[in-house]
């Protein structure tokens, strides 16, 4: 396992437009947990995403327009619109504030049925728990990354927290053919051919919404960078770097 000590964000080319920096779809935010998807959307915006659409519960629409005017907003229950958005997105994040009731299950199932092989999928929060409970296979799309904390990883992998060693985690990651950002003290980033560990970060980051922000940055960088692995590790490092310096 390599200690990640530095990253470089690629400079943008002059002759580009917003369509070159990701067509992002965020799915989440039920009637009680709208703040999670708003924070994820704001993280996407401030990380440089080109086009962002948020599918969320109607009670969150006014707050999203106010707090994140750069993002487009649709009703998560509008399956016709959601189908179109899934088809036209490059990268899709599902999970922040999604909820664990039947509506959350339905949204997760609907996405898994409609996602395309060329797309990137980021699975966070409640969506990880739903996948664990439903025991569904990881979709065969271009790239998949899970962003669990240790309890969510226990649900997904079956490995108790106290037994989450590098060796056991690596074996579980290889079985699901996905990248995993395991959030903890000394966050670990499991990619296809490499594993990284962070030594930056702070206990001040142990607060609500921190994971939603991380998933938003990861989604944003995946939409902008050509190299998936580099996007994931860079986003994770930047998130911890900012948290440490702001504290």
Describe each PLM feature range.
Residues 1-120, 129-145, 154-247:
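Small-residue (G/A/S/T)-rich helix-start motifs and N-terminal tracts that mark the onset
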């Amino acid at each position: 396992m390599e200690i990640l000590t530095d990253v470089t964000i690629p400079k943008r080319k002059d002759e580009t437009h917003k369509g070159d920096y990701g067509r992002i779809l965020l799915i989440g935010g039920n009637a009680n947990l709208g703040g999670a998807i708003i924070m994820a959307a704001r993280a996407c915006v401030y990380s440089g995403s080109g086009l962002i659409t948020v599918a969320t519960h109607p009670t969150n629409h006014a707050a999203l327009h106010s707090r994140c005017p750069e993002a487009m907003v649709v009703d998560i229950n509008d399956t016709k619109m959601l189908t179109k958005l899934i088809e036209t997105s490059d990268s899709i994040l599902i999970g922040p504030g999604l909820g664990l009731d039947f509506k959350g299950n339905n949204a997760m199932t609907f996405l898994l049925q409609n996602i395309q092989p060329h797309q990137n999928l980021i699975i966070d929060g409640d969506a990880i728990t739903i996948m664990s409970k439903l025991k569904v296979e990881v979709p065969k799309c271009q790239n998949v990354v899970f962003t669990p904390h240790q309890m969510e990883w226990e649900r997904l992998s079956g490995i108790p927290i106290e037994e989450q060693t590098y060796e056991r985690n690596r074996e579980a990651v290889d079985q699901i053919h996905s990248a995993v950002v395991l959030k903890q003290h000394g966050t670990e980033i499991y990619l296809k051919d490499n594993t990284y560990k962070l030594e930056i970060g702070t206990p001040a980051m142990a607060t609500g919404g921190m994971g939603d922000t991380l998933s938003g940055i990861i989604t944003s960088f995946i939409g902008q960078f050509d190299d998936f692995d580099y996007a994931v590790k860079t986003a994770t490092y930047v998130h911890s770097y900012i948290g440490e310096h702001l504290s």
